[in-house]
Amino acid sequence: MITKPDKNKTRQKRHARVRGKISGTAQRPRLSVFRSNSNIYAQVIDDVAGVTLASASTLEKENQGGTKSEQASKVGQSVAKLAIAKKITEVVFDRSGYLYHGRVRSLADGAREAGLKF
């Protein structure tokens, strides 16, 4: 019997492999992305202290409306504004095992437009 590989399990394996290599610090925290079917979430995380410094998602009113890619761009811009307000200008981008395409790329582009460097 032929079985299809579970896409989410392979993504989680990729994410675990990458997380062993990258880590966020107070000077350069990690911008982590989580994508569900209907929403997208972004967090700026200091892994040394284990603290989330800023977060945004499509659950917030100002990030709703438009296509999913447009919403992702809005989330990227709002998380970047929150991070810059806390004097964070550089981050490490953690795509959480997702392909750098579609909503993940839109979020990254939105964050770059708002002034975050990675």
Swiss-Prot record:
GO terms for molecular function: 5S rRNA binding; structural constituent of ribosome. Keywords: Ribonucleoprotein, Ribosomal protein, RNA-binding, rRNA-binding. Residues 10-20 have a biased composition (Basic residues). Disulfide bonds: none annotated. One of its GO terms (cellular component) is cytosolic large ribosomal subunit. CDD domains: Ribosomal_L18_L5e (cd00432). The keyword RNA-binding applies. InterPro entries: Ribosomal_uL18_bac-type, Ribosomal_uL18_bac/euk. Pfam families: Ribosomal_L18p. SUPFAM superfamilies: Translational machinery components (SSF53137). One of its GO terms (biological process) is translation. Residues 1-24 are annotated as: Disordered. NCBIfam families: L18_bact. Belongs to the universal ribosomal protein uL18 family. Part of the 50S ribosomal subunit; part of the 5S rRNA/L5/L18/L25 subcomplex. Contacts the 5S and 23S rRNAs. This is one of the proteins that bind and probably mediate the attachment of the 5S RNA into the large ribosomal subunit, where it forms part of the central protuberance. This is Large ribosomal subunit protein uL18. It comes from Oenococcus oeni (strain ATCC BAA-331 / PSU-1).
